[in-house]
Amino acid sequence: MVVTAVIPLTAKKVKVEFDHQFTLVLYKGELNLFHLKEGAQVPDELITEIENKILKKRAVKYAMHLLQKKDYTVKELTDKLLHAGYSDSCAEHALEYVASYGYVNDKYYAVRYLETYSDRKSIKKMQMDLRQKGISDEMITQALEEAEMENEQDTLRCFAEKKARSLDLSQEKDRQKLLRFLVGRGFSYTDAKNVTDELVIVHNER
C-alpha cells in the first residue's frame, strides 16, 4: 500500500490514508517509528502489525473508557469506535473483548431501558428507541417478557393528567392537543382517546 495522505486531527494525532481509502489514526510519534510519510510504500504486514500490536489494544482501552461513563449497545459502541477512526477489525476486536466480560450486552441493555423508562414512555416508543440503538426485534421481544415495567395504562394516565394541567379541556382545540400529544408519545389512538374523554368528564364535573 502507498501512503496517500497524512491528515492532522489534533495536536498529537493524525489520520494516515493508504491508497486513498484505508485509514489508520496514529500519534505523530508513531509516524517516525514506522517511517510513514506521504508517498511511502508500506507492506501489508506492517499495517497488520500496527493494528494487532497497537491499535486493537488502544480500541479496547477506548471502549472501556466509554463504558465507564454509561452503558452502550453493540451498535452504539461500534459507531463510537468507527467515528474515532478505528478500523472495522479493531472495532470488532474491542467489541469481542468487552462482550466477553459482559461489559456490553444488548439483552441486558434492553431490559434495563424498559424498566427505566416504562413510567414515562409507551411500549411502542421504547421499542422504536431500542431499534434505533441497533437492538433486534427478537431481542426486544425477549426483553419485554423479562422486564419488570410499570403498567402502560398507568403511564398513559400519568402523562395525560400532567399535560392536561396546562390545557383547558372545555375547549375542543385543547382536547385535540392532548390527544395529539399522547399519540405522539407512542400510545395507541384508541387508548389516548379513552383517557382524554375520561379527563374531559372529570373536568366537566368540577
Region spans (language model):
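An alpha-helical, amphipathic repeat domain used for nucleic-acid recognition
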Residues: M1-R206
